[in-house]
From Swiss-Prot:
Belongs to the FBPase class 1 family. Disulfide bonds: none annotated. Pfam families: FBPase, FBPase_C. Homotetramer. It comes from Nostoc punctiforme (strain ATCC 29133 / PCC 73102). Mg(2+) 1 binds at E113, D135, I137. This is Fructose-1,6-bisphosphatase class 1. Keywords: Calvin cycle, Carbohydrate metabolism, Cytoplasm, Hydrolase, Magnesium, Metal-binding. It comes from the Bacteria. The keyword Zinc-finger does not apply. It catalyses: beta-D-fructose 1,6-bisphosphate + H2O = beta-D-fructose 6-phosphate + phosphate. The keyword 4Fe-4S does not apply. Its EC number is 3.1.3.11. GO terms for cellular component: cytosol. The gene is fbp.
Amino acid sequence: MAKTPESLESSINEITDRALDRDCTTLSRHVLQQLQSFSPDAQDLSALMNRIALAGKLVARRMSRAGLMEGVLGFTGEVNVQGESVKKMDVYANDVFISVFKQSGLVCRLASEEMENPYYIPENCPIGRYTLLYDPIDGSSNTDNNLSLGSIFAIRQQEGTDSDGKATDLLANGRKQLAAGYILYGPCTMLVYTIGKGVHSFVLDPSLGEFILTEENIRIPNHGSVYSVNEGNFWQWEESIREYIRYVHRTEGYSARYSGAMVSDIHRILVQGGVFLYPGTIQNPEGKLRLLYETAPLAFLIEQAGGRATTGLVNILDVVPKKLHQRTPLIIGSKEDVAKVESFIQNGH
């Protein structure tokens, strides 16, 4: 039965109202809505997410001009604490996060994969109760090729005074994270986050200079066709991982997708389902990815979306690091697909 003009107008108004409500939902407003509170703790978390968003805007602006500016692309000639060659964009993004959080008054320490030790902000430490852990640029090898990149972040509450400057309270499992997420720098700049109340995505509207809500309570499919892994490392892996790769090669319905930027690959899997693997190798069974800056934040987010993250033997969020820059293997994504990889690791099939 055809709708009456009145009911049609009502439907249009309802759609318009929903669109306007979405357009008005900024990141800071959304955090407060999620916490259903204007308590000091809720306002702190909202302010911290605003700072992360500002860092993302600054990095995105720099990237959008990278091909037009001197001194942005290429390597610095230095090596970081991980033994990796440092890109100029790594240094810039790391400095951006430090500068942005110096002004927050809430963060006493920042810990990054680019710095051997945490960066302390003395003027914030008397009142700053939080620590930001982050990977300023994920996939920096993509920078010079104009491909997608990302930033990964987590917020933890400081425990104790850390008077000796060793930050031992950070050596705790991933369930201590208050918030985590990533910023994806692609055709648009997207921020995806969780504070333990689901996973939500925002897109940077350049005309407003604001991250605007695009999707709430994202759920990862239980199974997907995509597997994402650098198959160039095939002969460096344990036989169990090689057997899994042989399995997906001979089984109909699987598609390989690997961009070289973990944030980009995991975002695809969050939306479409599937599994991302960065296993250890025979020579380095602990893997390459850093627990505190990369795997734990992403594990928190994916679990909140209904997925799983594991080393192959242990849930990532249950791993207790022994040192700040501890590495770990990572299998992350849809529940069924992660379970299949685990089965190969634990049972050989």
